[in-house]
């Protein structure tokens, strides 16, 4: 570097080159790093969208309880295409009660792909005519708009998931060979952990996710029942916890391990946390060795 006040492209280029050559810790921008950053952005974006949709679904349940409370007992769930189609067209018990039977039948048949027909339409209309639901135009309008927002979010989430799947297909991670881990949850785990070479052991990943037990000691008091730290990446903690529940359902080895911990008298959440540790050890091994998970016979 010169003490003279010189600013040219050549001087700038030489300065940058000198800095890069002197820093031995700098690493090139790899495809793996790019994929991890893209996945992190996409999975966190999806997480926020799903959370937003969940709040809207709660609002739908609340509004239906006001406008047509009997409907919830007539269907498996309010959050299905046929129910949304019904409420978008007839957003209260009064609207359903006065609906033309042919129109109601056609709407239900089309939106349910033939599952619901005339008999269901009659059941809905009879229930609506005897309903104790309130006739509130403002709430009906809110219900229609809320359903529309949910449908828009569904479309956005599908688009995000398509982008996630494209990247996951390129990465071809071995953790997707674990029963119960799909590309959505797998993508979240990979994105939040990033480069597995950063971690010397599975315990470091657990600490990074906030699954390590906290330590409390003061005087003669030593915390015997330490809680999890719950620090670090909340996204990774969420992904590992939920992935573990699915894996324990679909994989016999993990199912037996969870049952063993429950038989020892541990609370369900405590037993799941033990299974999380086991899953992280498996994921760490698979990513380090690039081996596929072999399901026990």
Name the predicted role of every residue range.
Residues 1-297:
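A detector of single, family-specific signature residues
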